[in-house]
Amino acid sequence: MLCQFSFKNFKSYKETTTFDFQATSIPEFSESLLKSEKADALLPVGVIYGPNGGGKTNLLLALSCLISTVVKPIYELEKAREKIIIQQKISAAPFYFNEISREMPTEFEVYFRQGKNEYRYNLSICGDDIVEESLYWKSIGGKRTGMVFDREGAEITLGASINKASINRSVNPKMPYLSFLAINYDIPVIVEVQKWFESCIVKNYANPIADRQIMFSADESYRKKIVRALNDVDIDVSGYRYDEENHELYTQRMIEGKIYELSFNDESDGTKKMIAALPVILLALQEGRLVIIDELDAKLHPKLLRYVISLFKNKNVNKKGAQLLFTSHDMTTMKNTVFRRDEIWFAAENERHESEIYSLYEIRRENNERVNSTAAYDKQYLEGRYGADPYLTNMLAGGDWQ
């Protein structure tokens, strides 16, 4: 499970930026939190709102860049241990509007849980070269942190969890050492970290191949889950079939004891979008994965979007700690009946054209109090109270809202 992600000098983001899945102490939707006996609770959902060009997509691209940088070499050499749902390699591009930043490295740090341990992985890239890289771990609830490896340029230091005598410390400067170890060795701590990175789903609607592989899995129980989910949102299908010869999907309906088929192309847009989104969402819920989707609301009707969000927040459905991170423009779901205040985030540019993010929980009113959990979030957002400059500086500082 993702706890926290930080990055610096990536596209529209110049300074260190942190997105946090660690739950605050607020009471709303406490039953939906991902809880561990010895660790702080995590959020099952995170949504990012904001104006076009504010940096919503670039935040997701930063996380996707880190994931793909680690996973791509493993995948290309067919050393993956998990079913990888990632479509393309994303390059680390520095901040646009500063000559010094263009020459500086892009930095990433991800803090996550896998198995019984917590890991903190850092990666710094300048051009195509790895400048710095490190991996540290500790047991969940533990206090002692151990180094797995630390890399500065060509110098690599190994921790006690790795048998130093048999490990090659000479690696291509363009390849993450984490990827190198995953490809060439069977080291338990590396395998666990590798599995987390490989489990992350970066949803790309431009390439449906991965969805098709999931949707037409031989696992009949999985196919039934897809049909049940469609039925839950009043899409009355009894099954589906894929014609390999014609490469065409057909939905099936049972009417008076007889099965009728309809070409996917003849379905309504809402049905098409739901069928397109469901495979990776259900896979994430079934296996406890993180799924990252840009503009999820553009793919789904508001009713369907609310349904998808509810799946991740329902502990009876989300039994393995799946998480959903997405961007949205949809105001109908920006409500206290859908999200906690720490699940709602905003991305906007400041006066220096640098993207910044902040959560609804962080915003202070003029009396220095936080936004109330009973507030009409969508209404106040449209009034400009949660928006970009000139409101941003005043709100975070507890200034005047007008």
Each language-model region and where it sits:
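Short beta-strand segments that buttress and anchor functional surface loops
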Residues: 108-113, 251-253
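Conserved ABC ATPase signature
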Residues: 44-51, 242-282, 290-303
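Extended helical coiled-coil dimerization/tether regions that scaffold
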Residues: 8, 204-266, 272, 377, ...
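Pre-Walker A-like glycine/lysine-rich segment at the N-terminus of P-loop NTPase domains
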Residues: 2-68
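C-terminal lobe/lid and adjacent interdomain/linker elements of RecA-like ASCE P-loop ATPase modules
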Residues: 1-4, 253, 310-402
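Electropositive, glycine-dotted interaction segments
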Residues: 116-242
